[in-house]
Design a protein with these regions (language model features):
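Solvent-exposed, non-transmembrane regions of integral membrane proteins
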Residues: 1-239
Length: 239
């Protein structure tokens, strides 16, 4: 069993299986929007519990991909532990540590997505100007004002919204939301997506908390650093 997880063939075939499953998913997701569209409106584990588990005919590839990722994670851990146990020398330290940094980055990225999938939250909806809405973790949001800047012909030049965050009924932060300009507080991000004036000024907001974002960022940095270092060392050896 240990040799199975140490084998490079296990890695290659697992990656090949993942590519095939993702190819199937690229067809299934647009073909069954009624099942997969909810993935954008809630965290992953909630979607799995509420939707995916009851539609296995359309989501089987997703669960198979999760199983393949678990196998790849175990394969990565076993290979890294085996490599660390070997003898180390100053001459080949960087050459041997670089792949382990890449592995660590990959595992941190997976950890980040796992945390975000299970312990975050994602809410979305239209919020009228002046409205007050409760949020998880004893927080609340108030949309104070919607601002639209137009030219002399009435065309929109810019738009924004002022929002306030409350915690335990106390005002803790106020900021301006705009396109690509979210408001953050304690890991909670508030995003302004669009405005609606048909039924009075209202804003389409997305409120999300991803506790794994930092871990995924660290993993991405480690993965890039390890890859660049390994590539540079291999290049020097060839030259």
């Amino acid at each position: 069993m240990k040799n199975f997880f140490l084998s490079l063939k296990t890695t290659v075939w697992t990656l090949f299986t993942l590519v095939c499953l993702f190819f199937v998913g690229s067809y299934m997701m647009p073909a069954h929007k009624e099942v997969f569209s909810a993935m954008n409106d809630q965290i992953l584990f909630h979607w799995v519990d509420n939707t995916a588990s009851g539609n296995l005919g359309q989501t089987w590839w997703f669960f198979a991909a999760l199983a393949a990722l678990v196998l790849l994670t175990i394969n990565t851990l076993v290979c890294s532990l085996q490599a660390i146990k070997g003898r180390w020398s100053r001459e080949d330290f960087l050459l041997r540590i670089s792949p382990q940094v890449i592995h660590a980055g990959f595992l941190f990225i997976l950890l980040g997505h796992l945390l975000g999938a299970g312990w975050g939250f994602k809410l979305s909806g239209m919020m009228p100007e002046g409205a007050f809405a409760p949020l998880p973790e004893s927080m609340a949001l108030r949309l104070q004002e919607i601002r639209v800047k137009t030219d002399e012909r009435g065309y929109t030049l810019d738009w924004a919204a002022e929002a306030s965050i409350y915690e335990d009924n106390a005002l803790v932060k106020t900021g301006i939301l705009g396109p690509n300009k979210p408001l953050f507080y304690k890991g909670v991000g508030i995003y302004l997506k669009s405005l609606d004036f048909e039924r009075g000024p209202a804003a389409l907001l997305v409120i999300a908390k991803d506790p794994g974002a930092v871990w995924a960022f660290v993993g991405g940095v480690l993965f890039i650093l390890g890859s660049m270092t390994l590539l540079a060392l291999k290049w020097n050896v060839r030259v």
